[in-house]
Amino acid sequence: MRIVFMVALAAALPFAAYADSAPTNQTAQAILDRVLANRPMKDFSLKARLFVGTEDPVPVEIFVKNTPGETRTLYRGRQTEALVVQPLHGEPKFYLRGVGELTGNQRTQKLLGSNFTYYDLGLAFLHWPNVKLLDEDRVRGRDCFAIEARADGEPYPRVELWIDKEYYALLRAEAFDTNDNLTRRFAVTSFKKIGDAWVPRGLEASRVPPAQSLPSEEKSRLEVYEGDYDTHLPVDWFATEKFHAESGGGRNGTD
């Protein structure tokens, strides 16, 4: 079975996973390297609905441009257009049409008012150097590696990851604040076959309010209903120059 995952957001970082025999005694870094290496080289596009609270769902289009050195993912919904540039090696960069590059706390702005932030879409924690293997676990009936990642100067100092042991795909991530309280959770909830590929049909992003715990959480959900896994997308759609700040204000991520 071939699986194409957009993790955490569902849109986050796309990658392809193939069943493979796993070497024994792997390190956490070796496992994450395999996750990052398992990505498609084809362009593809998806149509989805973003559910935020009790409001009507927001139509979202997701376009993915893959090259040997990086993945560029474009999100379009309402008046918002956001771009995530994820090098194969290195930190992701984030751009918002009419605003320009997002840096610092700007990276944690919400996509269309949801609990999916731009920072989450880049899955930067997959690149953090301080990682360790915690144990083996199960998520939605799948055997997983449980991995802890830590980093200084990031929105979350600690993240726990659950990686599917067969397909080397991220199925769940939980982020913790400086007091080691669970603050965010991302999960793949279901899958859909598009052509010869399987993609996440449902993805959830949950925010846990301060001093509270699960299930007292605020959820947003992205549901994919259509896609084209073998398409050719225009290069200029993904040019960072198109996202420069506009004088007098521009679009924002909560339109």
Predicted regions and their residues:
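Bacterial N-terminal signal peptides
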Residues: 4-14
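Sec/Tat signal peptide C-region and signal peptidase I cleavage site
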Residues: 15-19
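Flexible, processing/modification-adjacent segments and terminal tails
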Residues: 20-33, 37-42, 87-158, 165, ...
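Extended lipid/amphipathic-ligand handling interfaces
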Residues: 35, 61-66, 188-193
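A short, Trp-centered hydrophobic/proline-enriched beta-strand micro-motif
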Residues: 38-55
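Solvent-exposed N-terminal domain segments of exported/luminal and surface proteins
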Residues: 43, 69-76
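Solvent-exposed loop/turn segments connecting transmembrane beta-strands
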Residues: 53-58, 78-81, 153-156, 179-183
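Gly/Pro-enriched, hydrophobic low-complexity segments
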Residues: 140-238
